[in-house]
Amino acid sequence: HSIRRRQRQMCIRDRERRRGRIVNLSSIAGRFVTPGAGWYGASKHALEGISDALRLELHSFGLQVVLVEPGLIRTGFEAVSEVSLQQQSTDPVWGPMMCRVAASWADGFRRGSSPELVARTIASALETSNPKPRYRCGKESEALVLQRFIPTELWDALVRRRTIG
């Protein structure tokens, strides 16, 4: 709710000036999820939907809405998610898969891009006179392009192979 509340405050102020820009920070998980990240992906997917709707709704007021979709970024997020995965790893049914997911995530975040890349992407989205609706950045973000061109079954197989073996 805090995102919506802040956006509403900005819209009231910027609508009168007939210019302004909202930059929402999402994740590639908003467009595709991996095993073990369903709830996180759902929250990011919701932010993507809100951003798309706002972009359409606010256009006539001269307001722009931009979405930044980072891939794997070295932020320490893996330490937070590791706690959840470790709790699930004790389950006799889900445990073996969650251990493989945890190993996959740890490897991915180790190879992740720097947070500075996201900061530069946000700055670019703010500074350009004609921003794109979406900006991808960071490791694995190119997967968003690939996902659009292959059948769902093949995509699922690729994700499963990379995350749960």
Cite the ranges covered by each PLM segment.
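C-terminal beta-strand-loop-alpha-helix "lid" module of Rossmann-like NAD(P)-dependent dehydrogenases
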Residues: 60-109
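Helix-to-beta-strand junctions that scaffold the AdoMet/dcAdoMet cofactor pocket
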Residues: 14-17, 59
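Hydrophobic alpha-helix immediately C-terminal to the catalytic Tyr-X-X-X-Lys motif of short-chain
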Residues: 46, 50-58, 68
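Residue(s) in the substrate-gating loop at a strand-loop-helix junction
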Residues: 27
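Core catalytic loop region at the nicotinamide-binding pocket of NAD(P)H-dependent oxidoreductases
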Residues: 65, 103-149
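Active-site helix of classical SDR
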Residues: 43
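Active-site loop immediately N-terminal to the catalytic Tyr-X3-Lys motif
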Residues: 32-38
